[in-house]
Amino acid sequence: MNETQSNEQILKLFIVSDSIGETAQRMIHATLTQFPDLHNVEIKKFPYIKDEEEFLNILNLAREQHAIVATTLVSESFNALGHQFAHEHDIPYVDYMSDLISIIEKVTHSQPLMESGALRKLNDEYFKRIEAIEYSVKYDDGKHFTDIGEADALIVGVSRTSKTPLSMYLANKGYKIANIPLVPEIEIPDNVYKQKGLKVFGLTASPQYIANIRKNRAETLGLSSESRYNNLDRIKKELVYAEEVFKKLNATVINTEYKSIEESAFYIEKFLQPKL
């Protein structure tokens, strides 16, 4: 260590927030990257500030230690107190929230929530959505059955009744969805029938409608359009089997013929608890 470094004054930064303080912390770290030669930096966090006495104690400590105060406080009274104290005691004070809130409110004529931790709430919603998508991908098309009881809903139906698109649409809204294709020759595992309280939705459509979709799908894949997959009699047999499964699972039946994914999802959501 050279003499310059040893004599370098410690830069002290206080992060004060009525939530976790991650917004100010990110801003400070982003700013400090502009000072790569600055090594003696001390950052202290004071999260979840709820009363003015506690806030004043922190401001007094900042005054004594010659610290810069960076805040993300939603409370107008806290912000007013902080600005006043900093002005009276010559404390370097950065308010990351109130100025921008005021400007956006003025420009848009919209009322802010004035809610602490709104970003964290948004992040929580994001991670819940990711978790739901990961679950729904894992349990798509009958790939897994082990934790199927964790699903918010189970969707069953024959091929080309929109099971996967509907599952992914609902997953993006925070719902964990499992879906199982119904094929007469392949039995559904017993543990699926034993699930208690699992909401089940059976997707169906007319034989001719499904046949047309399957024919188009086969042609897209470069397969023969005249195959067992899109044979009308075969599809009728699959639908009879599907009806039997719907009854066993006490499924709510949805006819997806000429329905958009949004329409079917809207109907299913009426039976589910709101997620996000």
UniProtKB/Swiss-Prot annotation:
Matching PANTHER family: PYRUVATE, PHOSPHATE DIKINASE REGULATORY PROTEIN 1, CHLOROPLASTIC
| UniProt keyword Ubl conjugation, yes or no | no
Look up keyword Kinase and say if it applies: yes
Question: Which key words are in the record?
Answer: Kinase, Nucleotide-binding, Serine/threonine-protein kinase, Transferase
Give the catalysed reaction(s), semicolon-separated. N(tele)-phospho-L-histidyl/L-threonyl-[pyruvate, phosphate dikinase] + ADP = N(tele)-phospho-L-histidyl/O-phospho-L-threonyl-[pyruvate, phosphate dikinase] + AMP + H(+); N(tele)-phospho-L-histidyl/O-phospho-L-threonyl-[pyruvate, phosphate dikinase] + phosphate + H(+) = N(tele)-phospho-L-histidyl/L-threonyl-[pyruvate, phosphate dikinase] + diphosphate
Species source reads Staphylococcus haemolyticus (strain JCSC1435)
User: Source taxonomy lineage?
Assistant: Bacteria, Bacillati, Bacillota, Bacilli, Bacillales
| Stated name of the protein | Putative pyruvate, phosphate dikinase regulatory protein 1
- Role noted for this protein: Bifunctional serine/threonine kinase and phosphorylase involved in the regulation of the pyruvate, phosphate dikinase (PPDK) by catalyzing its phosphorylation/dephosphorylation.
- Gene Ontology molecular function: any one: protein serine/threonine kinase activity
Question: Member of which family?
Answer: Belongs to the pyruvate, phosphate/water dikinase regulatory protein family. PDRP subfamily.
